[in-house]
Amino acid sequence: MTSTTTQPTTQPMAKPKVAFAHLGCEKNRVDTEHMVGLLAEAGYGVSTDEEDASVVVVNTCSFIQDAREESVRTLVGLAEQGKELIIAGCLAQHFQEELLESIPEAKAIVGTGDYQHIVDVLQRVEAGERVNRVSAVPSFVGDEHLPRQRTTDQAVAYLKVAEGCDYRCAFCIIPKLRGDQRSRPIESIVAEAHQLAEQGVQELILISQITTNYGLDLYGKPKLAELLRALGEVEIPWIRVHYAYPTGLTASVVAAYRDVPNVVPYLDLPLQHSHPDVLRAMNRPWQADVNERLLNEIREQLPDAVLRTTLIVGFPGETEEHFQHLKHFLETQRFDHVGIFTFSPEDGTAAADLPNRVDPDVAQARKDALMALQQPIAAERNQRWVGKTVDVLIEQHNPQTGEMIGRCARFAPEVDGEVHVQPGDDGQQAAPGSFVPVKITGADIYDLTGHIVGARSMVAEARVKD
C-alpha cells in the first residue's frame, strides 16, 4: 500500500491596508492622489478610514509654523493609536532623519520628490526596514503616466503643470522644500486633461508654485498662453488658474483668458504687499511697478474678471506708513476675494533674520483692520450679481429640503464662497456634478443665493423683455 504526503501550500501574506491623511495645499493633494493610485495598482487595500488601516501615510505640510504644528499633532495622535506611520511631504523633506528619531512609530519618511517610490518604501517597511527616502534636491514631477486616484469631488480636479519654484521670496521656504521649477510639456498636461475629462471632471484647476512662469525652464520662456489655448480643445467647461504671479500676466496670457471660452476669467494674484519698500524687503522689488498698471489692464481687457489676492502684514520693517499705503491700495483696487496673513518667521528663510520685527499684537491689529475694510467691499462685489442668471456647478444636494449648494465661476473651491440654490418654480432640482442656470436673488459678504431657472421662468422673463 502506497501512502502519499501532501505538502502544505504557503499562502502569500496579505498586504496591509493603508490609509492616507492629507494636510496642506492642493499641490500636496495631487501627490497624495498619485500615492493612492500607485498603492492601489500594486494591490494594496486603500481605506479612507484611519481606524480601518494598520499603516497610515501622512502627507504633511511645513509651509509655516502653524502648519508644522498641525502636521506633528496629526502624527502624534496616530502614533498614540498604535498606527505605523509613513511620513511624506514637506515636513519629511524639511526635517528628514530628525523625524525618524523623534517618532518611533514612524517607519519611513518620503520626500516631496520621492512619492513615486511609495510602493517600494512600503515593501521595505513590511520587510522590517526603517526607510529614509528623501532626495536632497527634489527633481521629480509626476505626469499622466503615473497612476492617480482622485480624492476630490468627482466634478473638480487639480492638475499640476509644474513643480518647484525658481523665485526666492524672503519669507518663503517652498524652494527648499520643493526644489527649483520643473515644468511638464504642454502635450503631457493636455493628455492628462483629456483623461480627467473622460472621468467626468467639470472644473479643472491648474496649479504650480507660480503658474504664470509655466514653461520657462522647459522652453526658455513662459508658455502659459499657449497652454491655455491648447486646453481650450479639452471638453471641460471650466478651466481655472491658481497662483498667477503678476509679472507673468503678459498681454498674450490676458488675451488667452479673453479668447478661450472655457478659461474662467478668475485671476488668483498673490501680491503680498503694495509698498515698494516692503516688496524690496520681500525680495519682490520688480512687482511695485506692476501692481496697479496690471490690475487696470486686466479690468480693461476682462471686464468680468474676478480678482483674488493674498496679503501679508507685519513683515519686518513694515511701518505705519507702509501699512497705510497697503490699506489705501486695498480700498482703491476693490478685490473680489482677499486672504490676509500675519508674517510668520520661518527658519531657513532670509526674512527670519531681518531686524525691526513688528510686534505681533500690532500685526494682528493690522490684519483685523484690513479684514474690516475688505468685508463691505466683498459684499458689494457680490451684490453686483443679484438679478443676474449664472451657471452654477452643483456640489451638494439635500433631497429632504431640495436645497442645493454649488459655485459659480467667481468662486474657487474651498477658498471662496458658495451659491445656495433653491429649486426652480417648477420644482426643478439638480444632482451634484451638473451645471444649472441660477438666478441670483441675494448676496452677503461671502455667498450668493438664488433659484434654478426652469423653462417657465425663462419664457416668462423673455416675454417681459419683449
UniProtKB/Swiss-Prot annotation:
Coiled coil: none annotated. [4Fe-4S] cluster 1 binds at C25, C61, C90. [4Fe-4S] cluster 2 binds at C165, C169, C172. It holds the Pfam family UPF0004. The keyword Metal-binding applies. Its main location: cytoplasm. Residues 383-454 form the TRAM domain. Residues 151-380 form the Radical SAM core domain. One of its GO terms (molecular function) is aspartic acid methylthiotransferase activity. Its cofactor is [4Fe-4S] cluster. Residues 16-127 form the MTTase N-terminal domain. GO terms for cellular component: cytosol. InterPro entries: Elp3/MiaA/NifB-like_rSAM, Methylthiotransferase, Methylthiotransferase_CS, Methylthiotransferase_N, Methylthiotransferase_N_sf, NA-bd_OB-fold, Ribosomal_uS12_MeSTrfase_RimO, rSAM. GO terms for biological process: tRNA modification. It is found in: Cytoplasm. CDD domains: Radical_SAM (cd01335). Binds 2 [4Fe-4S] clusters. One cluster is coordinated with 3 cysteines and an exchangeable S-adenosyl-L-methionine. Keywords: 4Fe-4S, Cytoplasm, Iron, Iron-sulfur, Metal-binding, S-adenosyl-L-methionine, Transferase. HAMAP family: MTTase_RimO. Catalyzes the methylthiolation of an aspartic acid residue of ribosomal protein uS12. Belongs to the methylthiotransferase family. RimO subfamily. This is Ribosomal protein uS12 methylthiotransferase RimO. It comes from Synechococcus sp. (strain CC9902). The gene is rimO.
